[in-house]
């Protein structure tokens, strides 16, 4: 049987995709914490698409808080 593996998003090391892989998709607690720290330091962003066609009462409209929508 072929075991599916994925690359650790932090270091690229192959990680078996099994329930026994405690930190998947990361290879270790260290790589998991490095990734969490990058999110906390705002090194990663989620792109936002500005949408001028939103009605004012729609989420993200003029009265709905932040403008734009997640892409």
From Swiss-Prot:
Please name the gene that encodes this protein: yacG
Binding-site residues for Zn(2+), renumbered to this chain: 8, 11, 27, 31
What keywords are assigned to this protein? Metal-binding, Zinc
Q: What Pfam families does the database record attribute to this sequence?
A: YacG
GO biological process assignments: regulation of DNA-templated transcription
Task: Return the similarity comment.
Answer: Belongs to the DNA gyrase inhibitor YacG family.
Cofactor, free-text remark: Binds 1 zinc ion.
Renumbered to this chain, region (Disordered) spans: 48-71
Stated role = Inhibits all the catalytic activities of DNA gyrase by preventing its interaction with DNA. Acts by binding directly to the C-terminal domain of GyrB, which probably disrupts DNA binding by the gyrase.
Q: Which cofactor does it need?
A: Zn(2+)
Q: How does it assemble?
A: Interacts with GyrB.
Q: What is this protein called?
A: DNA gyrase inhibitor YacG
């Amino acid at each position: 049987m072929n075991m599916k593996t994925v690359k650790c998003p932090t270091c690229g090391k192959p990680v078996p995709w099994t329930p026994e892989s405690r930190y998947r998709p990361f290879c270790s607690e260290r790589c998991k914490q490095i990734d969490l720290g990058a999110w906390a330091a705002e090194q990663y962003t989620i792109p936002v698409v500005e949408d001028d066609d939103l009605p004012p009462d729609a989420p993200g409209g003029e009265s709905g808080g932040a403008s734009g929508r997640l892409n």
